[in-house]
Amino acid sequence: MSVNPFLGPANPVGGMTEAPPRHRLPDGPMAPSTAYQLVHDELMLDGNARLNLATFVTTWMEPEAGLLMAECRDKNMIDKDEYPRTAELERRCVAMLADLWNAPDPAGAVGCSTTGSSEACMLAGLALKRRWALRNAGRYPSREARPNLVMGVNVQVCWDKFCTFWEVEPRQVPMEGDRFHLDPAAAAELCDENTIGAVGILGSTFDGSYEPVAELCAALDDLQERTGLDVPVHVDGASGAMIAPFLDEDLVWDFRLERVASVNTSGHKYGLVYPGVGWVLWRDAAALPEELVFRVNYLGGELPTFALNFSRPGAQVVAQYYSFLRLGRDGYRAVQQAARDVATGLSARIGALGDFRLLTRGDELPVFAFTTAPDVTAFDVFDVARRLRENGWLVPAYTFPANRQDLAVLRVVCRNGFSEDLADLFAEDLTRLLPELRSQSHPLTLLTWDALRTARRAARALSGRR
C-alpha cells in the first residue's frame, strides 16, 4: 500500500505500510477511524439504494426513526423479561395489524414479529402442515400420505424453500396467456386429502398484481361442499397487506374470509420500516397448534416463542411501532397513494413511448412490469436494464416462470422515497437511451451469446490442435 504523506481526512490510513488481509484476521488492531474508512470506501462501490427500483425494501425513514433504532440496537427481541416494554410494543403491533386485517378478536390476536416475510411464511406453512398432520394422525406419516401445498407458480422463492425444507410437495398453478398468477378453479382442482393449504399472493413479485383471494376461497368452499375437503388459505401479503387496507378498502382478502387462516406481511416493505422485520398473524388460537409454541425459562421468565431463530434485534419492531404511531391510517393511506400515483403515472409515460408493452400499470401494488413492443427487434429488456444501470438505475430484467418462459420483462417498484421528481429523471433517462437502442441491429444479449459460442468453438479447436 502506498502511503500519501498528507495525513488526515485525505489519507486516513497514514502509518500503514501494507494493506490489511481480506480473507483472514489481521495480526493486530488498527485505529477505528482507519477501519471505518477502509470499509466505507469499499461500500461506495455498492449501488445507490434510493435508485434501486428492483427492491421492495424500505430505503428511507425519518431521522427520528433512525434515532430510536440506534437507541434499541443492543436489545435482543427474545429477552422479553429483560425488555418488557419492547415486548409490549411488539404485542401492540400484532393487535394493530389484527384490527387492520379484520381479525375476529384483534385484542386477543395470535401473532408475532419475524425477520421478514420469508420467516413469516415458513411459520405459517408449518402451522398449516401441523394442523393437517393432527387431522390425519391415523395415516401420517406414511408413504401414502405425503402433504402438499397448492399455490401459483409466481410465488416468492420462500415457498419453494418451505416445501423443500419440510418435505411438502409443491403443487403450482402455471401461468397461461395473459394470466400471470393463480387461477382459483385450477388451484381447487389440485387439492386432495393431502393438501395442507392453499396460498394466495396479495401482490405478485413478478408484476405487482393481486391474486383473487376471495375467488380462491369461494372455489375451495365449493370443493368442500362437493368432497368434504376443508383446505385453509394463507395470504402472503408481503407487500399488499400494507397497501390494500388503505387504498382498496372494498377488496375482501383478509380475515373477513372465514377460510383465511393466516396472513403475513413485511414491515420492511410497505410497512415503511428499514430491514428486517416481518409479521405473521393467525385468525385465532386454534389456527396455531399449541405444540409449535415453545416455552423457555432461562432468560428470567416463562417465555413463549414461535420462530425459526432465537436472538434478533428489537430495533426494527420499535421502528414499526413508531411508524404506526407516527402515521396512523390516514398517514399510511397518503404515503401508499403517493407511491401508487407515481407508479401509474410513470407506467403511462413508458407505455406512451411506443417501444414497450405494459403488462401491469401499478394500480394494485405500486409496481408494474413491461416488455418490449412486438415490433421491437433491435433491443430487448436486458439491453434496457444494462443501459439504465449505466445511469445508476437498478431495474431487474427477467423471464417469467412456466408456462411463460418466453416472456422477458422489466419491473419497476415504486415505494416511499421514489418521488415524482425521481420518476421524471428515470423517464428522461429511459427516453434518452432509446435512439441508441433503436439503432442496434440486434439485441446485445444475442450478440454476447454468439460471441461466447464463437470463443468456445475457437477454444475447442485450439485444444484439438494440441
List the predicted regions and their residue ranges:
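N-terminal entrance/gating region of PLP-dependent enzymes' catalytic architecture
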Residues: 1-108, 392-393, 430
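Conserved PLP-enzyme active-site core in the AAT-like
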Residues: 7, 115-294
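Buried hydrophobic packing segments
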Residues: 90, 94-97, 120-129, 159, ...
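Short Gly/Ser/Thr- and Asp/Glu-enriched loop/turn motifs at secondary-structure junctions
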Residues: 106-108, 144, 360-367, 405-407
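Conserved PLP-binding active-site segment of the aspartate aminotransferase-like
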Residues: 199, 366-378, 392-427
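PLP-dependent enzyme catalytic core of the Aspartate aminotransferase-like
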Residues: 223, 404-466
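Active-site C-terminal subdomain of aminotransferase-like
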Residues: 246-249, 253-366, 371-375, 455-458, ...
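Short amphipathic alpha-helices in soluble, non-transmembrane regions
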Residues: 381-389, 426-431
